């Protein structure tokens, strides 16, 4: 799957056309008010581009939360998003009470020029995801002919299709792969994601460094293996490191994370690294706690000293930070996925913060720095570094699957150039 050879919105002729656009308006709400409008703001350049270039209408579709294929307008309606979008765009937004069916089709058939229309939550229909469950917890499965009808109805709402929801690109949902129109383009958010991941996966600058944190080795096996075919250096940190250090150095790890399943392939991973001449750096010292709590008693440990029984490592220590800084300084391209410690608690945030500072420094010297979504993106928000790195991905699961070497259905479905 090529990331760089897909039709993009700037190459799509939208003049006089109805644009149906998949966006990610899955935003936090409290009492029917949007509490963080970041994702809505992020979609504005694509929406405005269509309007400025003479689109007849822009029909927006999104999911919100997990209604699991059941209509729950009291809890998961996108109606409050329409109000927020109206104030951000400075123009009226027509909200429709459903995303498919005759009323939606009629409203979108012949709209006044320059209309912006927001459809109700796609996931109120089990046909969007293909499966779900009812309020009593019984599993629901969509019938194939109904999925087809759902997709056909969505396809009637526009003349051209734009996908700007990278965060859902790893899901083969109806709105991602089932809108059957001749031209399907990526919006500007999606394009930025694909451009940056193409830089990493299709033609990387070197030395190329991957920094992998997070907890379980088993969850990251595919990621580590795929990246070992691409990078020159790798840092393995976070909770994942203890499984490696126990197997490779016979380190005493106390009550720190040990992943039995992951342990069985540590040697295979190291052999692959050696074969590919990839230099892997592990932590050498740690900040430890007598229990997994924010206000725990704090201590220090090294790989050599081991971690005392009952204690748990929750961050890497100052010597590790120095080692990592040297590795980062050598790189021309960095992909970072997963924090190095329990960064949510200040006592255990120093390792992740120190690394973030080094990555910001590297970026200012011309290194390309890509932050995978999820927790690592949260770190950027926490320390206000979103504008100080090259790219912060909006898709946790989607970016992880790309880095694992998987094909993303939502990208695959776009028109090829």
From Swiss-Prot:
The lineage of its organism: Eukaryota, Metazoa, Chordata, Craniata, Vertebrata. ADP binds at residues 214, 238, 343. The modification Phosphotyrosine is found at residue 196. It is found in: Cytoplasm. CDD domains: Phosphoglycerate_kinase. This is Phosphoglycerate kinase 2. InterPro entries: Phosphoglycerate_kinase, Phosphoglycerate_kinase_CS, Phosphoglycerate_kinase_N, Phosphoglycerate_kinase_sf. The modification Phosphoserine is found at residues 2, 4. Pathway: Carbohydrate degradation; glycolysis; pyruvate from D-glyceraldehyde 3-phosphate: step 2/5. One of its GO terms (biological process) is glycolytic process. Keywords: Acetylation, ATP-binding, Cytoplasm, Glycolysis, Kinase, Magnesium, Metal-binding, Nucleotide-binding, Phosphoprotein, Transferase. Pfam families: PGK (PF00162). Essential for sperm motility and male fertility but is not required for the completion of spermatogenesis. Testis specific. GO terms for cellular component: cytosol; sperm fibrous sheath. HAMAP family: Phosphoglyc_kinase. Monomer. Its main location: cytoplasm. Mg(2+) binds at residues 215, 218-219, 375. (2R)-3-phosphoglycerate binds at residues 23-26, 38-39, 62-63, 65-66, 122-123, 170-171. ATP binds at residues 215, 220, 239, 313, 344, 375-376. The gene is PGK2. It comes from Sus scrofa. The modification N-acetylserine is found at residue 2. GO terms for molecular function: ADP binding; ATP binding; metal ion binding; phosphoglycerate kinase activity.
């Amino acid at each position: 799957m090529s990331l760089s050879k897909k039709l993009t919105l700037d190459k799509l002729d939208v003049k006089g056309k109805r644009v149906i656009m998949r966006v990610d308006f899955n935003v936090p709400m409290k009492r029917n008010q949007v509490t963080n409008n970041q994702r809505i703001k992020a979609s504005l350049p694509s929406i405005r581009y269509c309007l400025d270039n003479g689109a007849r209408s822009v029909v927006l579709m999104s999911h919100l939360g997990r209604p699991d294929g059941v209509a729950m307008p009291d809890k998961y309606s996108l109606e409050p998003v329409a109000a927020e979008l109206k104030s951000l765009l400075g123009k009226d937004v027509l909200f429709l009470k459903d995303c498919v069916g005759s009323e939606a089709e009629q409203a979108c058939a012949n709209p006044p020029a320059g209309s912006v229309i927001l459809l109700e939550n796609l996931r109120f229909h089990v046909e969007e995801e293909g499966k779900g469950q009812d309020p009593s917890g019984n599993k629901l499965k969509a019938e194939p002919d109904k999925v087809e009808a759902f997709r056909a109805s969505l396809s009637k709402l526009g003349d051209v299709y734009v996908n700007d929801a990278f965060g859902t690109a790893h899901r083969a949902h109806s709105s991602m792969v089932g809108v059957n129109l001749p031209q399907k383009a990526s919006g500007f958010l999606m394009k930025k994601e694909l451009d940056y991941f193409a830089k990493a996966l299709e033609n990387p600058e070197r030395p190329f460094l991957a920094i992998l944190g997070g907890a379980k080795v088993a969850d990251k096996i595919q990621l580590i293996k795929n990246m070992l075919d691409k990078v020159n250096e790798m840092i393995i940190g976070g909770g994942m490191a203890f499984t490696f250090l126990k197997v490779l150095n016979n380190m005493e790890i106390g009550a720190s994370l040990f992943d039995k399943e992951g342990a069985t392939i540590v040697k295979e991973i190291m052999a692959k690294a050696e074969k590919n001449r990839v230099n892997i750096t592990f932590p050498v010292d740690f900040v430890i706690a007598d229990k997994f709590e924010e206000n725990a008693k704090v201590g220090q440990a090294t790989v050599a000293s081991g971690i005392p029984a009952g204690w748990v490592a929750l961050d890497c220590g100052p010597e590790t930070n120095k080692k990592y800084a040297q590795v980062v300084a050598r790189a021309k391209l960095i992909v970072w996925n997963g924090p190095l410690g329990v960064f949510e608690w200040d006592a255990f945030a120093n390792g992740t913060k120190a690394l973030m500072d080094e990555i910001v420094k590297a970026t200012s010297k011309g290194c390309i720095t890509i932050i995978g979504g999820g927790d690592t993106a949260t770190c950027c928000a926490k320390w206000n570094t979103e504008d100080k790195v090259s790219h912060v991905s909006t898709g946790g699961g989607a970016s992880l699957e790309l880095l694992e070497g998987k094909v993303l259905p939502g990208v695959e479905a776009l028109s090829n150039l």
